[in-house]
UniProtKB/Swiss-Prot annotation:
Function: Cell wall protein involved in development of asexual structures such as phialide and conidium development, and thus required for spore formation. Plays a role as a general stress protectant produced by the fungus in competition with antagonistic bacteria.
Gene this chain is encoded by: phiA
Source organism of the structure: Aspergillus fumigatus
Cellular location(s): Secreted; Secreted, Cell wall
Entry protein name: Cell wall protein phiA
Annotated PANTHER family: PROTEIN, PUTATIVE (AFU_ORTHOLOGUE AFUA_6G03560)-RELATED (PTHR42047:SF1)
Gene Ontology, cellular component aspect: extracellular region
């Protein structure tokens, strides 16, 4: 009897623990950068010019709510998308080749992914962080309008000649009222 009670208690504890670590309950989410002591800390992710940024003041996107400064994302079958109510998706790709060095970008509609790039491999981990192929992301300062450019970890600490890049946790935050946007190419 004691063993049965112990097993039931352990099972309940494991279930409660797993529930606390699950991915967002909503399909749509925003992302903020986490790196304590850095200017990128708590900066929201946005999309512009076929790239992903943190802390960009203006996305110059065509949105239902144009004053919002962050992008809305969703994952489907391991692929990451920018949310739009239209039937024309904008899908994220990653180029981890020697040329791409972890470049994260997006294509629109039927555009093919660039050579050497990957679309699948996105997931939200038990800490509620977005990762690509099980790795956290990288943020590099001094991009357009003072924003941070966002890169996948391809084993290059400062990709594409950037300097002072930092590893970040890309924290996922539920969005209950997604902002439909078409982002600039």
């Amino acid at each position: 009897m004691q063993i049965k009670s112990f097993v039931l208690a352990a099972s309940a504890a494991a279930t409660a623990s797993a529930a606390a670590c699950q991915a967002p309950t909503n399909k749509y989410f925003g992302i903020v950068a986490i790196h304590s002591g850095s200017a990128v800390q708590y900066q929201p992710f946005s999309a512009a010019k076929s790239s992903i940024f943190a802390g960009l003041n203006s996305q110059n996107a065509s949105c239902d709510r144009p004053d919002e400064k962050s992008a809305t994302f969703y994952i489907q079958d391991g692929s990451l998308y920018l949310y739009a109510a239209s039937a024309t998706p904008q899908e994220i790709f990653v180029d981890r080749s020697g040329m791409g060095q972890g470049k994260i970008g997006y294509t629109t509609g039927a555009q093919p992914a660039p050579r050497n790039s990957e679309r699948q491999g996105w997931a939200i981990d038990s800490q509620n962080h977005l990762q690509f192929q099980g790795k956290d992301l990288i943020a590099c300062p001094n991009s357009i309008d003072g924003a941070w450019s966002i890169w996948a970890d391809a084993g290059v600490a400062n990709p594409a000649g950037n300097t002072d890049c930092v590893g970040i946790a890309a924290r996922v935050e539920d969005v209950t009222n997604p902002n439909s946007c078409v982002y600039t190419q």
